[in-house]
Amino acid sequence: MGNICRSPLAHAVFEDIVKKSSAENSFEIESCGTIGYHVGELPDARMRETARHHGITMSHRARQLKKTDLDEYDMILAMDNENLANIRKLARNRDQLDKIQLFRNFDPDAVGEAEVPDPYYGGAEGFEIVFQIVARTAQNLLTELTTHKR
């Protein structure tokens, strides 16, 4: 929603994985929220600390999704169903709608659970759980994208 927890973590983790795979010239990675509450802010300090514990630096500044992003990017991934619905409302045609899906569609362990839980109102354990989900999903996303050339 506000682009300070889950999506900037996914951005940073995916960027790190892509760099380590030497595929960084193949991807343009961006993160944004569906609401503008935190525009210009760094990610939540608890999320940054969790990422730092795993060797990931989160320096992204929050921004809000724009309608033009749906033209500019090949894939738009939402962290939960509420964000998915909000992003779909911005779509102006079938091509844009087809780009939008849930991030955890790429999680091999997401049996019956399609959303990345929002850790914002919880404790440190929730941030670690989100990190594990995002890291696993980001790795599988890269494999899918480089193997199947979506």
What residue spans do the PLM features occupy?
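Helix N-cap/beta->alpha junction signal
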Residues: 7, 80-81
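Phosphate-binding/catalytic loops
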Residues: 75, 81-150
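Conserved active-site segments centered on acidic
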Residues: 1-73, 143-150
